[in-house]
């Protein structure tokens, strides 16, 4: 064995080195085609993305008037018109929307070019392997350099050392990840004010990329107080296009954002299942899980004050409620949640803060599963945020109690008519379509890059037309309840195998109409059982009270509802496998050659 190692040590070392380089991503065979873009004097590499349809080159808006230089593996070429371009040649003549013929490894494959419009570009550079490390855990942090360029190509910010980290709860499991950014020094990014901490929202469950932005804009325009500002950016990491993100101010207590004095604090309602992930959590007298997010070292009196707030909400005393809460802020946040159909309203990511001796609701956050995008909020003609019961084990305590208050209801109706309805009318008539049109090119690029993920997750029509239709129907329903005083009852259906409810609004003393809802079986074959008593409810009888009904089907019906999950991510990168196999084969060839050489007798010696 010792002789074997001595004779073959060089080959073994070469094999090991190639394997390590492959694992680090430094030496991968057949690197994808790329272009080098000159952005405000700096060169940025943009690598093409490959799927079953060929290669896709996603260029940022700032590349429109920039010089482009082609990067190709040895022997590869790109046909542009009558010209054959090879590695290092100018390719500024390529146009978005065109498909070019790429010769790679002796085969012709299509290369489709896209270019964004109206959107800034965020370039991040990290060491090889950094993103894999980050994706192993949200607790992992890494350093990167950052370059932010406006759509016109002007540099807006550069930072040689930003801290990059994963974030999110349910959104973290998706292939397109959300991140947090911490700059080395506070800076004003795209006109949102100077700060060090920022968030990159991935909108992985929102193919329209509109939901979070619309909810934030609705809150800001309604006067809810400080609301995180946001801008769309195309994100590139080490030359790879990660898609369209929403660069957003982080919810923090600091000057220029949510401003709090000594003795004041910011809290967030969360699911109890997330207890171990929370910083400074506690449970209220009624069992709510609350996280103290600011200050970092809270005063011992915070829990007692929150319990006083909770007692006032459930007291039934409007005078006490007005003395304890800023009722208008709670009404405004409720209106944002109800209008948007926020399924997590008053359950998770639900912020409130204590300032000037009273409790305020807000800022708003997390609307990527709103606007009818799930079975739980798909019906626009229903109350979604108001019902106290959201499902088995899911209780919206505060909204449920507040909606019983005459003071709260009167402020909801007045604010809806005076402030929210004009905003909704502008959104429906102009604003949503205008925003969607401005993102058309960026959304197309994002949806092609993440087509496989979206196909797996899709639960609702992602088109702008569907969003407009949903919001229009929702506005019509809420106006009938709050302006026309139609008396509604809420009926919630629990399907077998589901722990959440489907909400319906029924005019008092009318029959629930389920004709437009696919129950996967004939209505006559389903038993509707009252959740409170277990008694059978005649679905053809008038509804006189709020009801939760559990559906009981004949054996074998309905088929189980698929639960969308993020597609599994393989830890094996094909390029790494190819490089490792190549290194192994090279080593094997070397060993065979060495073995043959060792077996050959010296010249002039008898065998």
How should each PLM-predicted stretch be described?
Residues 1-15, 573-577, 592-599:
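N-terminal Sec-pathway targeting helices
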